[in-house]
Amino acid sequence: NSGNPCCDPVTCKPRRGEHCVSGPCCRNCKFLNAGTICKYARGDDMNDYCTGISSDCPRNPYKD
């Protein structure tokens, strides 16, 4: 996607010096800090948090 400032238009991977292209834990081409909520709890659920090393939002390990 050449319209994405984080994306190398040839490889569609993060540009040099950038961490990520997109994802719930990616903002302005960088990973969000560990502990940033990426999915708010619903009902009996628990919040999910960014790890600081990935653009993905991992499932809370304490969920049933």
From Swiss-Prot:
InterPro entries with a match to the protein in the record: Disintegrin_CS (IPR018358), Disintegrin_dom (IPR001762), Disintegrin_dom_sf (IPR036436)
Keywords: Cell adhesion impairing toxin, Disulfide bond, Hemostasis impairing toxin, Platelet aggregation inhibiting toxin, Secreted, Toxin
Protein name: Disintegrin VB7A
Other information: Negative results: does not inhibit alpha-1/beta-1 (ITGA1/ITGB1), alpha-2/beta-1 (ITGA2/ITGB1) and alpha-6/beta-1 (ITGA6/ITGB1).
Gene Ontology MF terms: toxin activity
Annotated tissue distribution: Expressed by the venom gland.
GO cellular component, one term: extracellular region
Compartments where found: Secreted
Family: Belongs to the disintegrin family. Dimeric disintegrin subfamily.
Quaternary structure (record): Heterodimer with VB7B; disulfide-linked.
Disulfide bond annotation, renumbered to this chain: 6-29, 20-26, 25-50, 38-57
Disintegrin domain sequence ranges: 1-64
Task performed by this protein: Poor inhibitor of platelet aggregation. The disintegrin inhibits the adhesion of cells expressing the RGD-dependent integrin alpha-5/beta-1 (ITGA5/ITGB1) to immobilized fibronectin. Inhibition on alpha-2b/beta-3 (ITGA2B/ITGB3) is low.
Chain ranges for the short sequence motif Cell attachment site as given in the UniProt record: 42-44
Record PROSITE patterns: DISINTEGRIN_1, DISINTEGRIN_2
Parts of the chain that traverse the membrane: none
